[in-house]
């Protein structure tokens, strides 16, 4: 999974009074993980509330790692998690997004009339200079760790865990959960990618419905 973005032309000054406003403070919030006291920014995109930062909860195992085992990357990118560590890492009241939830977020974000591609709306301005980061999602390119334990793609692409519950085609009973990294951006397009399966990837969460 990789993200390649061509820089946009500099925006011209706008005088139109009907211009879509940037995000307001009311659309942002905070969440404190009571397990370790970490405070996260949150953002609202459509009807969904997302963590606006990568998860940083430390596990008492090797199921979470810092990129290249170098803590200079931690504050910005958080931990990379293995599939085995996901359930323990997620705090109460939040969940790993499904394929449908990622698709819903992407579809809503791309409604912006100024949206060249979804990264121009949800990437951090530090990563993509031309991004408006309108909703405060602030996606960062945290890279991944592959099956050979090699770290790769830092500052180039973002890889996030996604979950799907399999359904028996006959009984329609919900079966095991399937985990994979899900969001792929390339040449201005985006799609769910269930072929990209690194050993460790970043985590963003969606707030449970109230």
What is each of the regions a protein language model found here?
Residues 3-5, 13-210:
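Conserved positions within compact, well-structured domain cores
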């Amino acid at each position: 999974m990789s993200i390649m973005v061509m820089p946009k032309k500099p925006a011209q000054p706008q005088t139109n009074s009907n211009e879509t406003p940037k995000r307001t403070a009311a659309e942002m919030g905070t969440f404190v993980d009571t397990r370790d006291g970490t405070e996260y920014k949150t953002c609202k995109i459509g009807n969904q509330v997302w963590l606006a930062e990568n998860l940083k909860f430390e596990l008492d195992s090797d199921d979470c790692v810092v990129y290249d085992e170098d803590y200079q990357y931690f504050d910005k990118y958080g931990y990379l998690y293995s599939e085995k560590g996901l359930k323990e890492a997620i705090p109460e009241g939040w969940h790993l997004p499904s394929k449908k939830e990622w698709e819903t977020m992407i579809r809503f974000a791309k409604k912006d009339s100024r949206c060249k591609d979804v990264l121009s709306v949800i990437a951090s301005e530090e990563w993509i200079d031309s991004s408006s980061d309108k909703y405060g999602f602030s996606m960062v390119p945290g890279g991944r760790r592959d099956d050979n334990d090699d770290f790769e793609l830092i500052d180039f692409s973002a890889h996030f865990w996604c979950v799907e519950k399999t359904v028996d085609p006959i009984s329609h009973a919900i079966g095991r959960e399937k985990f994979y990294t899900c969001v792929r951006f390339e040449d201005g397009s985006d799609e769910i990618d269930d072929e990209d399966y690194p050993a460790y990837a970043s985590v963003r969460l969606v707030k449970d419905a109230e």
